[in-house]
Amino acid sequence: MKVGFALVLLWSLPITNVLAELPQPQNLTLLTLNTQYVLTWDWDQTTTGNSVSFTVEYMAKYKMKMKKKNWSRVCERTTRTRCDLTGSDLHYLGMYVLRVRASADGVNSDWVNKDFCPDIDASLGPPSRVELAPVGNLLDVTISDPLTSTQHSMKEHVLFLYYRILYWSRSDDPQGLKPKVLDSSNNLVTLPELEAWTWYCVMIQSRYDYYNKTSSYTEPQCMQTEGDTPYGQIFLYFLVSMMVCFLLVLLSSYAFFRFYRGLKNTFYPSIQLPAHIQEYLCDSSPGSDMPRLITADSEAELCCDKLTICPEVVLLEIHVPPPLTAPPSELEQDSGRRIRQDSGDSGIYSTEGGSAQQGRSGGEPIRRDQEVDSWQTLEQVKMEEMGRELADERDLDEGVVDICV
């Protein structure tokens, strides 16, 4: 019996050494914001490798004195070094004990405990939303309370929650180095002592003095105040509006004029078609302006033949008699009379004939050579007149005329 007991004792010693060799998690820390709680810890991965897992449990602190302790398990065999306790429904004013242990290859480490009270340890968040609105030369600031994980106001858990408001003029203090401070527990705050038509920037912080809790400030928001409008600005607005109205009227008139002109040129062009074209385009009934571009089915088709009229070529033969050597003396008076008569019929008087008449009227004798030359000149003038008349008739007769049958 003694030998067997000694063997059992020797066998249990290595197991105790193995249990003691697994270290505990270190540096338990809580990351909190309003009612969001996350427990984190440190672990040296070189001791056991990646096969280690962790278990997290919690229990109300007043139950620690009871003989039977009932722990609530949150995270079991997790490989991460953090555990989210937000969904555990921890009361904000309660006090709890959190514990963590490591497990590897069926061996567990010792538990590591940490006390936690949300009312004391949980951080306070900034306002969930901030809105600015100008009211004359003042600014209204609307502040929305910080929210819990269930989207309820934190004032349900923190009764004496209030806000610290920092505001400054952006033109006088661009960096906000010397802001004005205003504390208020109201959700609607009016900033006093502001100037009209000035830009102001605002930052807000949540505060809880009982446990000395302060949140971070919100991002700066800027808004311009209003006030009575100066007369110069009113006149400027009026002038600009008048110019805009004038330009609109001018553009509208120009557009209407262009439209009217285009419409008039389309339907009533200034250049009319010739009458001989319009009579074929318009209806033949009197007083009708309807175009007759499409022929009615009842109208008979008109067939036209092409007729060409050419002038008849007439050859004119002119025989010039030989010059007379010496006309008889008794024919001198008849020859002069014939010359004057022929000149009167043709409407053209020769120079020589005129000079001969002047010579005869003056009583000077006319030589036979001069009479012969005058007669030849008169015949030449007649032939030129007949040639020009034939040329004019030939020009008039040339052309092609179409006649509809």
UniProtKB/Swiss-Prot annotation:
Q: List the induction conditions.
A: In the fibroblastic RTG-2 cell line, induced by polyinosine-polycytidylic acid (poly(I:C)), a synthetic analog of dsRNA, that binds TLR3.
Q: Which residues form the signal peptide?
A: 1-20
Q: Which UniProt keywords apply?
A: Cell membrane, Disulfide bond, Glycoprotein, Membrane, Receptor, Repeat, Signal, Transmembrane, Transmembrane helix
- Give the stretches traversing the membrane: 234-254
**Extracellular-facing ranges:** 21-233
According to the record, the residues making up region (Disordered) are 325-374
Quaternary structure, per UniProt, is: Heterodimer with IFNAR2; forming the receptor for type I interferon.
**Protein name, UniProt field:** Interferon alpha/beta receptor 1a
- Native source organism of the sequence: Oncorhynchus mykiss (Rainbow trout)
